[in-house]
């Protein structure tokens, strides 16, 4: 039985988290992918926000629920709740700031300590429009991604270069893992409904999908 039989407008719901240092452009990547918008005066995210977008993969409707949080030290207390239920992650750095790239190893370690073992991961070198200020060689980042079994893309949230590609590749990778049963979406129990009323099987164990796809903000994370 598909999720549409339960009244849902998607077949799969994937929680994806954006991680990386503050100021690398995570929020603008999120808004560019979900609403095709860019805020030139975007400030560091306070707390957590998420947005959704539905795409089609192999004739299945995939609803990506993408979470974004600030990278400052004081927000790391929300780590366990932020990563819980995530089946995909994008680690973002700024190609013009070497420190943001060097910290990717920390973010990868934190992800692996708090997320499922089979979470799909992509590395994003954002702000490719600042090529004249490049501080991180593409080949170096690409090799780091390969060594750690991550997808790799350089993007520009400003002019939208490769943003769609980066998210779609991750979503497809998650879908392929689900198809191979490398990710357990069924939860516990034997019936078709989770305790929160969301159908089991093809749906990630989250709360039922929100009726609105607009960003939700909260200064105090779950």
UniProtKB/Swiss-Prot annotation:
Keywords in alphabetical order: Acetylation, Autophagy, Exocytosis, Golgi apparatus, GTP-binding, Lipoprotein, Membrane, Nucleotide-binding, Prenylation, Protein transport, Transport
- Region Disordered, as annotated, extends over 186-222
Q: Which GO terms describe its cellular component?
A: cellular bud neck; cytosol; endosome; Golgi apparatus; Golgi membrane; mitochondrial outer membrane; recycling endosome
Segments carrying motif Effector region: 42-50
Question: Is Ribosomal protein set as a keyword in this record?
Answer: no
Supply the name of the protein. Answer: GTP-binding protein YPT32/YPT11
Misc remark for this entry?
A: Present with 4298 molecules/cell in log phase SD medium.
Q: Give GO terms: molecular function aspect only.
A: GTP binding; GTPase activity
- List N-acetylserine occurrences by residue: 2
Q: Out of the domains of life, which is the source? A: Eukaryota
**Similarity field:** Belongs to the small GTPase superfamily. Rab family.
Reported effect, residue 126 to I: Blocks nucleotide binding
Low complexity biased stretches: 186-197
Instruction: State the species of origin.
Output: Saccharomyces cerevisiae (strain ATCC 204508 / S288c)
Give the multimer and partner information. Answer: Interacts with YIF1, YIP3, YIP4 and YIP5. Interacts with the GEF SEC2. Interacts with TRS130.
Q: What does this protein do?
A: Required for protein transport through the secretory pathway. Probably involved in regulation of secretory vesicle formation at the trans-Golgi compartment. Mediates the proper polarized localization of SEC2, a GEF for SEC4, but does not alter the exchange activity of SEC2 on SEC4. Plays a role in autophagy.
Q: What does the UniProt record note about how this protein's activity is regulated?
A: Alternates between an inactive form bound to GDP and an active form bound to GTP. Activated by the guanine nucleotide-exchange factor (GEF) TRAPP complex, and inactivated by GTPase-activating protein (GAP) GYP3.
- What membrane topology term does the record carry? Lipid-anchor
């Amino acid at each position: 039985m598909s999720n549409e039989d339960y009244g849902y407008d998607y077949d799969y719901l994937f929680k994806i988290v954006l991680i990386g240092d503050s100021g690398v452009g995570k929020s603008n990547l999120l808004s560019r992918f979900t609403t095709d918008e860019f805020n030139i005066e975007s400030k560091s995210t306070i707390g957590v926000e998420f947005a959704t977008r539905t795409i089609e993969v192999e004739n299945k409707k995939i609803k990506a629920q993408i979470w974004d949080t600030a990278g400052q030290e004081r927000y790391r207390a929300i780590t366990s709740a932020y990563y819980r239920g995530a089946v995909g992650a994008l680690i973002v750095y700024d190609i013009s700031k070497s420190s943001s790239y060097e910290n990717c190893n920390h973010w990868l370690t934190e992800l692996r300590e708090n997320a499922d073992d089979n979470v799909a991961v992509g590395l994003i070198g954002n702000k490719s429009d600042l090529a004249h200020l490049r501080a991180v060689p593409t080949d170096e980042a690409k090799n780091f991604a390969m060594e750690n079994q991550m997808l790799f893309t350089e993007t520009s949230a400003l002019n939208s270069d490769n943003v769609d590609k980066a998210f779609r590749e991750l979503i497809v990778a998650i879908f392929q893992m689900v198809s191979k049963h490398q990710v357990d979406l069924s939860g516990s129990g034997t019936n078709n409904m989770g305790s929160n009323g969301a159908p089991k099987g093809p749906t990630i164990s989250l709360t039922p999908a929100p009726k609105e796809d607009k960003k939700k903000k909260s200064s105090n994370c779950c």
